[in-house]
Every structure is written in C-alpha cells, then in structure tokens.
C-alpha cells in the first residue's frame, strides 16, 4: 500500500489527495496517510529525512521508491495508477497541462505564497503589509493571464480536466480565501469571469469539494 506523508491542510498535500480521489484511490483502502508537518512534526525525524532530505511534505512512498515535490508526485500517480484513463494522455493535452504546472511554480505561486505566509505565518507585529498587499495585487495580474486563456476553452489544457487544473484551482481557491479573510490587507481581488466560470465547473464536475479548505490555516495572529 502506498503511504502519503502530509497534513490535509497543506495545499501541496491537497494536490495529491485530489489527484488520488480522481483516480479512484481512497485513504485507508488504497493508501495510508500520515499527518506530518507543522503541528504534527515528524518531517525532521531520521526516518522521514531518509525519504525526503528536504524535510517537507508531501512525500509519497510506493514500494521501495520515495518521491517528493507535489507536481512530480501527481505526474507519477497519473502515469502509474490511471487505469481508467481519467486524465487525457494525448501529447497536446499532456503538454498544455505541463505548461500550466510549470507556470504555476515559476510565475504565479511565488507572489501568492508570499502573501499567504505573510498573513498566516508571520506574527502581526512583524508583518509588512505594504509588501503583502503588493504580492497579492501582483497575483491579480497573474490570474488575469489564466482568465484570458480560459475565455476560449473549458479547462486549462483544453476541453478536458487535467493535472494542471488541480494545481491552479487550489491556488485560485487560496487567492479567494485570502481576500475573504483579510480584505483590508490584500486590497481588492480582481473579478475574473472566466476563472469564476471555470471554478464553477471544477466544483460541479470534479471532487474538488472533498479536499478544499473551508478556511485558511492561520498558525499565528
């Protein structure tokens, strides 16, 4: 049985959990999940560091192989466990999805992550709200790029749901939650109709609601 290390409220662990659900794989039946990271600890023990020397979650064990990096784990699961061809396998769809997964890491996530950490991990007395606001507003610009593409297609890689949609939808959800939770600190969230429509499809046609946070995990206030 596969073993997934990571807490459910980690956005990177949520990617894996959502992917597993879409593949028809369920916790306790098809894989074991161990809470790790933040309040659960365990990710800096000698046992864990043998699996992932970075000491980060998620980490996946499958037989004698250990994988880290959430996007890599999703690619592996889709390649090895998608027996019913849930995700498209044609080259065009595959690499459009890959493109968005890479864009998320290099262009979009850094600003959103900085705003999130600034508001949920840094004590209030130490927060730089000017930088937090700038990072959030820069995220608005990044999401406008995605919105423009979704104007002409149903999902990020074309007509079918793919791994890239998992990555991006979780980030859009966090972008929305940040503004709902800290509206005065983030500044306004740009209204992007094509992203709104895409998220509506995601909630209606996929298993997003089973793993998505209802509120932010705020560690410090």
Regions found by a protein language model. Give the residues of each.
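Structural motif
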Residues: 24, 55, 153-154, 206
């Amino acid at each position: 049985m596969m073993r997934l290390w990571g807490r459910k409220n980690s956005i990177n662990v949520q990617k894996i959990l959502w992917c597993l659900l879409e593949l028809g794989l369920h916790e306790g039946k098809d894989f074991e999940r161990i809470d790790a990271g933040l309040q659960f600890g365990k990710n800096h023990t000698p046992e864990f560091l043998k699996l992932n020397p970075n000491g980060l979650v998620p980490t996946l064990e499958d037989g004698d192989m250990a994988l880290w990096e959430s996007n890599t784990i999703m690619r592996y699961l889709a390649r090895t466990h998608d027996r019913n061809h849930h995700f498209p396998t044609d080259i065009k769809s595959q690499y459009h999805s890959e493109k968005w997964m890479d864009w998320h890491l290099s262009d979009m996530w850094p600003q959103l992550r900085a705003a999130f950490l600034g508001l949920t991990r840094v004590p209030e007395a130490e927060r730089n709200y000017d930088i937090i606001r700038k990072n959030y507003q820069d995220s608005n610009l990044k999401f406008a790029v995605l919105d423009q593409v979704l104007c002409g297609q149903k999902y990020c890689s074309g007509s079918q749901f793919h791994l890239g949609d998992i990555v991006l939808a979780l980030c859009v959800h966090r972008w929305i939650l940040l503004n709902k939770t800290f509206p005065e600190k983030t500044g306004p969230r740009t209204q992007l109709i094509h992203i709104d429509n895409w998220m509506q499809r995601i909630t209606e046609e996929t298993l997003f609601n089973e793993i998505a946070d209802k509120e932010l995990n705020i560690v410090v206030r």
